[in-house]
């Protein structure tokens, strides 16, 4: 590989490290955007089948070109800025929403050595960068100078902060048993132990000893992304479309892309942190990216399944679930895991 790249390295000279990093960024973001586009089609198809409908089937064979048509439509639509809006902040809102969604992928490993930035504080970076997104939502709601976007953005801020706390405590449990903030090390730590040696690798993954945290993390991830049944932020019957009411064209599309990119991010993080990432469930099958993609696809299906199945929760119920149920459970489980690790019954020695 190095021999093949040698002429290119000589061509760019001192600029090669920057060019190589940029190439890796494009290699992550381009497929991600394609996945986001076709996730919208998958969502419409899955929900259609659940409601005994066909879903999109007109644009291209079996409707496969529908996401391209939707993207082109949004690309050529005018971005209308309301008269009373703060124009600079109005445009900044969608950018602040999508930037953290893309930046978070820098520390996500796709396989052994397949990561853009293999930093030791990857988990901490993820917590920090994903919490920035709420500022984009708040700015969008405030800059629109309209009551519905403002109400929606306040709801979003309260909801995202509430569930970030529970997710943070769930991640502390993962940190305790993995003894590392590096996501690659967390996956490696799930590939060892008695069950792994017996060939039943899936029994050594974190989802079994941390099952309550696994459920809390997944549900909190759905709430963090403002997806149904936690979509009170854009409840059509209450606040029309929340903070996105006044947006059109590509400005609206950026919020849309951020939401679906976050869905994929939460799904892949759940796979990496709790179900072994790219590790094979049984020892006689090889590890690889295929397993990570399969697990991520399953969790994405859970997102779509939840949307098609559950009615929207009332806002006070969502707040109560976050503060009075999830946070106490995660706090107790952090203590349980810490005591369990110190006891003679520890399974992590």
Swiss-Prot record:
One Pfam entry name: NADHdh
PROSITE patterns reported for this sequence: COMPLEX1_ND1_1, COMPLEX1_ND1_2
Alphabetical list of InterPro entries matching this protein: NADH_UbQ_OxRdtase_su1/FPO (IPR001694), NADH_UbQ_OxRdtase_su1_CS (IPR018086)
Domain of life: Bacteria
Keywords from the named record: Cell inner membrane, Cell membrane, Membrane, NAD, Quinone, Translocase, Transmembrane, Transmembrane helix, Ubiquinone
EC number, as in UniProt: 7.1.1.-
Annotated membrane topology: Multi-pass membrane protein
Any one GO CC term of the record: plasma membrane
GO molecular function: NADH dehydrogenase activity; oxidoreductase activity, acting on NAD(P)H, quinone or similar compound as acceptor; quinone binding
GO biological process, one term: aerobic respiration
Record field: transmembrane: 19-39, 88-108, 123-143, 161-181, 202-222, 249-269, 284-304, 325-345
Class of this enzyme: translocase
Reaction catalysis annotation: a quinone + NADH + 5 H(+)(in) = a quinol + NAD(+) + 4 H(+)(out)
Annotated localization: Cell inner membrane
Protein task: NDH-1 shuttles electrons from NADH, via FMN and iron-sulfur (Fe-S) centers, to quinones in the respiratory chain. The immediate electron acceptor for the enzyme in this species is believed to be ubiquinone. Couples the redox reaction to proton translocation (for every two electrons transferred, four hydrogen ions are translocated across the cytoplasmic membrane), and thus conserves the redox energy in a proton gradient. This subunit may bind ubiquinone.
NCBIfam families: PRK06076.1-2 (NF004741), PRK06076.1-3 (NF004742)
Subunit annotation: NDH-1 is composed of 14 different subunits. Subunits NuoA, H, J, K, L, M, N constitute the membrane sector of the complex.
Homology family: Belongs to the complex I subunit 1 family.
HAMAP family tied to this protein: NDH1_NuoH
The protein's name in its UniProt record: NADH-quinone oxidoreductase subunit H
Classification lineage: Bacteria, Pseudomonadati, Pseudomonadota, Betaproteobacteria, Rhodocyclales
Gene: nuoH
């Amino acid at each position: 590989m190095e021999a093949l790249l040698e002429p290119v390295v000589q061509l760019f000279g001192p600029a090669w490290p920057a060019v190589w990093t940029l190439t890796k960024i494009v290699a992550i973001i381009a497929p991600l955007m394609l996945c986001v586009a076709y996730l919208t089609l998958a969502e419409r198809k899955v929900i259609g089948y659940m409601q005994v409908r066909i879903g999109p089937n007109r644009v291209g064979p079996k409707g496969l070109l529908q996401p391209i048509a939707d993207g082109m439509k949004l690309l050529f639509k005018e971005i209308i800025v309301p008269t009373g809006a703060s124009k600079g902040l109005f445009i900044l809102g969608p950018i602040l929403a999508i930037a953290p969604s893309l930046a978070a992928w820098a520390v996500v490993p796709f396989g052994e050595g397949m990561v853009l930035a293999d930093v030791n504080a990857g988990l901490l970076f993820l917590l920090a960068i994903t919490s920035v997104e709420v500022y984009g939502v708040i700015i969008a709601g405030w800059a629109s100078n309209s009551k519905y976007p403002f109400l929606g953005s306040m709801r979003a801020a309260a909801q995202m902060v509430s569930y970030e706390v529970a997710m943070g405590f769930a991640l502390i449990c993962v940190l305790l048993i993995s003894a590392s903030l590096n996501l690659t090390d967390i996956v490696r730590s799930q590939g060892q132990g008695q069950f792994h040696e017996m060939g039943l690798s899936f029994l050594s993954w974190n989802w079994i000893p941390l099952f309550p945290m696994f459920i809390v993390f997944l549900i909190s991830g759905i709430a963090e992304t403002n997806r149904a049944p936690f979509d009170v932020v854009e409840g059509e019957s209450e606040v029309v479309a929340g903070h996105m009411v006044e947006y059109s064209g590509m400005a609206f599309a950026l919020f849309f892309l951020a939401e679906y990119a976050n869905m994929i991010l939460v799904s892949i993080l759940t796979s990496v942190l709790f179900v072994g990432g790219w590790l094979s469930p049984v020892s006689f099958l090889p590890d690889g990216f295929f397993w990570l993609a399969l697990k991520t696809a399953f969790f994405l299906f859970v997102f779509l399944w939840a949307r098609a199945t559950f009615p929207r929760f009332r806002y006070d119920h969502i707040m109560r679930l976050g503060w009075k149920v999830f946070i106490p459970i995660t706090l107790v489980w952090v203590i349980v895991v810490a005591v369990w690790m110190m006891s003679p019954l520890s399974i992590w020695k």
